């Protein structure tokens, strides 16, 4: 019988129960025992849901209090020295939270660990920090306790752990030069014995299968990392009394395929949604291994074409029999939990969609079809009818948008003058001091703001009342920025629920859910828009808010837009046309907004592209095509302004060395970036490339509630000035302030402005 399994399930809860419990605990409103009870209840509920859907092997270890990589670091005892962890004591929950956030209800505050994107997704993981002589030990029992929980509830647990090579590859350390540094492989001698001990612990618990995630096998790996695989897995297999399922996802294995097939594991999972590995080469080399195929898209929300999936796997099933397993392509972490909750989506659109729970039901339909179960026929027919209806729907295509997209090839992608001439005109218009200060855009979203927005959407406030409340918040934000003496102001984005959702609600072709939340990091959840059809802007989206803010001050106020690539990347995107076409439709809509902002007297316009790098294909051979259309879309949206209008962009959690030419090709007048957690290391790319335009390196980490020190920020900017001309430098936080409290924001920005003043005096 074909085994159905799941690589992971969303941990946040259908109504974000984990987020609410986390934040209550951090605020001191919930005891740790109460927080742990919430986590246990969510695990129990999610396991039951998966079992009801027909999952045979239950993933355990996909739950995490903040991030699964951080969770595994704590299990291994990988705790940086600044957190003062006793080398012989267990790593407790508050230490884990301090590593993630810089502080917790107990323990001394310290600088949080670096956070970065999980491959090409919008999820973030906490980067493990390794010393050159790093030791490892089992320092936390929670994973083993969860295995016992699952067994007690009658499930067959399949623990899920990061593979040792993926864990090292994703780590950093002062002695190591980037992800690919083979010097990290020297730590395997210390690491592998602990992995062997972990596997033995699982065996002692009666575990039959362990899922070891090695997603770096979909990357372009150096030879040294490829060669390490056989050595590592020989050692793991020789000690393991459980069966090992090597899981890969987010793409095909390419030249790593034969390496994976040679490993002494009992099963191999391949992503058949994003991967294109030749199964004709896999089967002859598979031996007696299990082949798990990820045939349900774990990263999007559209119904699966089950007929096509069956066509692809039926012959394989005939050949492999029970050694063919079925699963989603990757963890369902990247999907909302349950479509059944959605009571505001219209029935037509809803019939096209599938969330995590529904994806497991699709998996069960495939499994039933392979098993010859006639009971699945009606489900297959329902699926078939929904796909056909979507393809024929008049809501998908807009002839006017298609014509404008065709005409866009004739539009210029260049500013009127080069940067050196533009910046002189901009300085004359804006009259900014050296080391000008600004923020990235958003200010704290208070309870009053959220209540007003909720009441407005519920009809308890009319449009005029809501506008008045938002204008009061904007005025408050402008007053504070003037008091603290910032140079380029923002309106604070009080009216925006989310930097992508806000724009999607005002553009044609988008739809929104009520409960379609996915985890971005920690307690931060986002509700991605659904791009189901052609995109266009029916009317101005931000102009009146920006015009009002500018009327309150003589200082320049930035217009704030989210860029086309980021809107694309942070949405669930239609799968019936190339992503580049959808992105250009968004770019044309933003081009109209940029022009209207300029006409309204807004002389600084920021188009955020924090997701530009995460859109890179994982294989470098595919980068050029992506970067060509991504840069084209940004320029399509921005180049129509006059020379004295200053275009800003913002990027966060990015590494720039390998895409610096594309960043320069955007030709933004000012780029602000996240650098505080990396101690300005990211600026090396801009120095080595001789980046020509202005740069604002983030001087403090907004993800931590700790107050930034003036001297530390001055020191960071002095490091920046060693790498870049000081006349090109701006001073700003590393990201928006939406998630911070007002008292934290006031203290941090006052210190930041004082740092800028000290820099001016010293220059």
From Swiss-Prot:
Residues engaged in binding L-methionine: 440-442, 493, 608
Chain residues that bind Zn(2+): 650, 652, 674, 735
InterPro entries: Cbl-indep_Met_Synth_N, Cobalamin-indep_Met_synthase, Met_Synth_C/arc, UROD/MetE-like_sf
Cofactors, names only: Zn(2+)
Active site: 703
E.C. designation(s): 2.1.1.14
Enzyme class at the top of the EC tree: transferase
Residues reported in the UniProt entry to bind L-homocysteine: 440-442, 493, 608
This protein's UniProt keywords: Amino-acid biosynthesis, Metal-binding, Methionine biosynthesis, Methyltransferase, Repeat, Transferase, Zinc
Molecular function as annotated in GO: 5-methyltetrahydropteroyltriglutamate-homocysteine S-methyltransferase activity; zinc ion binding
Residue sites binding 5-methyltetrahydropteroyltri-L-glutamate per the record: 16-19, 117, 524-525, 570, 614
Keyword Cell inner membrane: no
Reaction(s) catalysed (UniProt annotation): 5-methyltetrahydropteroyltri-L-glutamate + L-homocysteine = tetrahydropteroyltri-L-glutamate + L-methionine
Protein purpose: Catalyzes the transfer of a methyl group from 5-methyltetrahydrofolate to homocysteine resulting in methionine formation.
HAMAP family: Meth_synth (MF_00172)
Protein name: 5-methyltetrahydropteroyltriglutamate--homocysteine methyltransferase
Organism this protein belongs to: Alcanivorax borkumensis (strain ATCC 700651 / DSM 11573 / NCIMB 13689 / SK2)
